[in-house]
Amino acid sequence: MIFVLDVGNTNAVLGVFEEGELRQHWRMETDRHKTEDEYGMLVKQLLEHEGLSFEDVKGIIVSSVVPPIMFALERMCEKYFKIKPLVVGPGIKTGLNIKYENPREVGADRIVNAVAGIHLYGSPLIIVDFGTATTYCYINEEKHYMGGVITPGIMISAEALYSRAAKLPRIEITKPSSVVGKNTVSAMQSGILYGYVGQVEGIVKRMKEEARQEPKVIATGGLAKLISEESNVIDIVDPFLTLKGLYMLYERNANLQHEKGE
């Protein structure tokens, strides 16, 4: 059984794969202040709830865009699982040809998504990941990672509205009954949702025009389903794209180490 861990700025998503299939997954808040023991006890409870234990896990891979948390997570893996985790970063074999000016600047989550997207859906491809920041990644027909776009996530946009406009309340981000709001809450819901949908459609349209291709558009992340239901540019929603990519990277690197006799 392989344990995969994707650490984002707001949430961390954990999963266990058995024989190539995602058996279970969990989401928890990213906490930069937790120790390896606190993370260890939390993961222990999650595993035990599914009838699993640390001993059932034979390999671990971690992707993180929050560097300060990595020390605690690596110590947790070594102390409780007795396994040194594979970390997505320099030295890991991805199979990607990254055409960024500085490939090291590409976030681990974007690399993992690209690996999974190419394997599952082919190329050319645009991957939209709705996280704390929303990222757009373009992979051309030759399976080269060409770059992308980074924008504030929908929650950051909403937080800016609450914090800068004193009389506006915090609201649930959901589809309103009509575009034209009849009260403050519905007007805000409409503005946040449809404003963001417009951003997604505009950016995807411009990316396609610049690429002079019709790449398939894959969406992932917490709000992918909500946005895709209101947009005509998203072809597929895959909520577990990142976890699948982590598993694929683990298998690729484990097989390479086996071939080298390590």
Swiss-Prot record:
Its cofactor is NH4(+); K(+). It is an enzyme of class 2 (transferase). It catalyses: (R)-pantothenate + ATP = (R)-4'-phosphopantothenate + ADP + H(+). ATP binds at residues 6-13, 132. GO terms for biological process: coenzyme A biosynthetic process. Its EC number is 2.7.1.33. CDD domains: ASKHA_NBD_PanK-III. A monovalent cation. Ammonium or potassium. One of its GO terms (cellular component) is cytoplasm. GO terms for molecular function: ATP binding; metal ion binding; pantothenate kinase activity. Pathway: Cofactor biosynthesis; coenzyme A biosynthesis; CoA from (R)-pantothenate: step 1/5. It comes from the Bacteria. Homodimer. HAMAP family: Pantothen_kinase_3. This is Type III pantothenate kinase. It comes from Bacillus cereus (strain ATCC 14579 / DSM 31 / CCUG 7414 / JCM 2152 / NBRC 15305 / NCIMB 9373 / NCTC 2599 / NRRL B-3711). The lineage of its organism: Bacteria, Bacillati, Bacillota, Bacilli, Bacillales. The gene is coaX.
